[in-house]
Design a protein with these regions (language model features):
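Distinct, well-ordered alpha-helical segments
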Residues: 28-44, 60-73, 139-142
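Conserved, mostly hydrophobic/aromatic
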Residues: 17, 53, 83, 127
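Generic structural signal for well-ordered alpha-helices
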Residues: 2-10, 36-43, 72, 112-119, ...
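C-terminal helical cap(s) of enzyme catalytic domains, especially alpha/beta-barrels
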Residues: 138-164
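Active-site beta-loop-alpha junctions enriched in small/polar residues
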Residues: 22-24, 55-59, 85-90, 132-134
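Surface-exposed cleft-lining segments at the edges of enzyme active sites
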Residues: 21-31, 56-59, 97-104
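Active-site acidic/histidine proton-transfer and metal-coordination neighborhood
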Residues: 1-49
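Gly/Pro-rich active-site loop or hairpin
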Residues: 61-122
Length: 167
């Protein structure tokens, strides 16, 4: 049903849309598919692309206790159209036991490492840095942009994304 709705939207817009992986704060029981299997099937059925939010992967992994690298490695490379990076914060009550995708902090080193891992596998993709609150000086924003550019450039020079995934 979701794939049909995505197709309806794409047909109405006469363009492909990208679906973003969400951040998770609790385990949802009874699902037929894991997130990557679900998103891969959505891509297959609807022809949509994926917007991979690396901070959402990290936040979800920390909150639910799974391996963020395994998730980053499992996204179908050919379907990824865009990447998002952002900062997160600890929950004001639960602290580091619950991370929240707040877009109000610098990008964490662990998120940068996941971004580098993803880009090394799939090659450079358009990347957006989200910063919605606690805006720093422009120089800090530019520094994050420069870091993302440097990661993409280094991966491109190393031949990232040239290995195709098995069908």
């Amino acid at each position: 049903r979701i794939a049909a709705n995505v197709s309806i939207v794409q047909d109405a817009l006469k363009r492909t849309i990208a679906i973003e992986n969400p951040s998770h704060y609790l385990t949802l029981e009874g699902h037929e598919f894991g997130e990557i299997a679900f998103l891969s099937e959505l891509v297959r059925r609807s022809g949509c692309t994926l917007l991979v939010d690396v901070n959402n992967v990290y936040v979800s992994a920390r909150n639910l206790g799974f391996d963020a690298e395994a998730i980053v490695d499992a996204f179908p490379a050919d379907a990824i159209a865009e990447i998002h990076l952002a900062g997160h914060s600890a929950d004001p009550v639960l602290g580091d036991a619950l991370l929240v995708d707040t877009h109000d902090a610098p990008i964490a080193p662990a998120v940068w490492a996941l971004y580098q891992r993803l880009v090394a596998r799939i090659g450079p993709r358009p990347t957006l840095i989200e910063r919605d609150g606690n805006l720093p000086a422009f120089e800090e924003l530019r520094s994050e942009r420069d870091t993302a550019h440097a990661v993409m450039h280094a991966c491109l020079m190393a031949g990232a994304g040239r290995i195709t995934e098995a069908a």
